[in-house]
Amino acid sequence: METFLLILLMLATVLASSVIDQLVPKVSSPLIQIGLGLAIAVVAGRQIDLLFDESKLFLVLFIAPLLFHEAKEAKKTELWRNRRSILSLAIGLVLAIIVAVGFFVNAMIPSISLAAAFALGAALGPTDPIAVSAASKDADISPRCKSLLKGESLINDASGIVAFQFAIAAAMTGAFSPAHAIGEFLLEFVGGIAFGLILGVIGNGIVRLVRSWGLENTTFHVLFEVFTPFIVFLAADQLGGSGILAVVAAGLVNVISPRTAGPSVSRLNIVSTSVWRVISFTLNGIVFVLLGTQLPRAMQTTWSNVAISNWTLLIYVLTISLILIAVRFVWVLLMERVHHRHVAKRNEKAAKEKNIAPEPRKSLAHDAHSAAIMTLGGPKGTVTLAVILTIPQAIAQRQLILFLACGVIVVTLLLATFVVPILAPQKKRDNTEQLERDVQANLDILRIVIEELSARQTPETRAATRIVVRQYNDRIKRIKELNGIEDEPNMKLRLRTLAWEREFARNLIETDEVDRFAGY
């Protein structure tokens, strides 16, 4: 009964946070929920500790469905286009952070062994996907930066967790085999992705099979979709792969609705979107409330320790945060410079073939600004805390390590909440932009009405529904014509046609078939 009451208390807290978020829009909802979690810790005491007795339980219960939904909603083409940069951040940067934090913490605090310091660095490697999404809402971040941050947060959990496990094993046994570690890492990384893709394809096959039998049941499809991440995580984990990566891979290939349109498809999309919106909001809130409830437990012992001053502890936290920021900034800056150099060479080659002026290269200041946004826009969060709380009691300076990790979580969340919007402020929209937003809102409303009408269509109302839907489509067409809105394929074709006309005119001028004045 007490556990049930605690669950109700957390749900009520999430509900309250949604109201407070509207009253205090400048403070991100994760920080509000963490603050409310701190208050719950005083009321609930140690009861919530049961959720963190086993980090795998936390991962499968909360992180798995959230990552599955994030991957399902992610823009696959952007992720694939930026795959090299995402893998660089999710694997290379995590390893760089492990090495930098490990050696620095061991040198700064000799009582923490090198292996334990590496474990701390591994726990601090992953970014929090929920906090990343929250930080992106309050800042004007470029599409590429958003894609990189989201893609990184989907993958780097696995690399950080695997590295953490090896570091803890080395700290406990005093032995470390690089060959064994690399083999295990490849098994978990590649195996997790492979298992996720296979299970995702199997899930799609099951849905298509049920659909082929004529069982167009919305309840079955939505429940099957919600059920999928838990099964994928547990199956991949039992097979030796990374459950986190398996869930992400399954989400990326998840296609629960068919490509053809129809009333049943519209109904399925509406229900699925609504269900996932509620699940995502609730789990996101509970995750950060739980994070708030765990901070006092993780930090109280070290904070009250008379053997080390509180000022020294704060200096340790700020120094480690600075190391993390510096390593991440340098890595991202170099990555962006290399990326834009390749893009510039490709553009120059294409411009030379078409005999047009190439686009100017991105400046160092531009890349430094983007790197600063991406550096502070990747805060640490629940995965870091869930992993660091599993450090065995036998590890020397365990409480100090917990304190340092929790302190860095708070610092990075504060920076993401208050500094990123300053670096990338949302642009003030003029009347033209407001008008465009209003027009787009009208179009969205009309499309939703069409989808709802199709979802509620019955055999008796089919003919009438088609007439009304045709009228709404005509309204959409008129609004587009009045406001000069074109669909993306038409726009691309028009731009391509203009490019051909310009190139043809330039050739006529160069061959003196027409004079320069007439050509231009």
Please identify what each model-predicted range represents.
Residues 432-520:
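Cytosolic C-terminal regulatory domains/tails of membrane transporters and channels
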Residues 1-433, 511:
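Transmembrane helical cores of multi-pass secondary ion antiporters/exchangers
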